[in-house]
Amino acid sequence: MMKKWKYALMVAATALLIPTFASRAEMPPIGMPSPLVEYKTYHALAEATDSRPLFLPKGTLLAGQCHLTDYIAIGGKLSDIRYRMDDGSTLSVRTARLVGEEAGKNISGVYTGRWESRMIGATEVMTAKTMDGSLAAFWTEGEYAFSVVGRKMSDDVFDALLSDVFVDMSEHFY
């Protein structure tokens, strides 16, 4: 009789402990980690993306009206440098090192609007205006892909930045 009680007690204890062990199982994290990582300096962003990100130099067209807001790496390969102007418009400048046969790659993040080809200097640049009025451009130079997106920005300011600063810099330094 004593053996039956020991056996019953052992079965009961096991039944009580099984849910305890099962509840300690680790649950996998839900969702995916963000591919966006912010950096504090240009050099940290360049190192993280193994590239030389295109940027808006101080003292150019919008001197004193343009403020750097973010250095962001996207997926560890694409840099996104963001600016805010005094008038509330914003500018995003992206750079990615091309791998293999990625020439002509659109890294702007803009996939609506009608893209048109135009020559700026010796570079073919694809430009578009979206339904919300944002202006976008992308092009490649050497082993790099570039894009610039302006939101709430006049066509004249965007075009001047694109031709006089960004495409010009990419033709001379990349």
Predicted regions and their residues:
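Amphipathic alpha-helical interaction segments
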Residues: 13, 50, 91, 123, ...
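Short, solvent-exposed recognition patches
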Residues: 26-135, 141
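Noncatalytic linker/hinge segments flanking ATPase motor cores
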Residues: 135-137, 167-168
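Surface-exposed amphipathic alpha-helical segments
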Residues: 142-144, 148-174
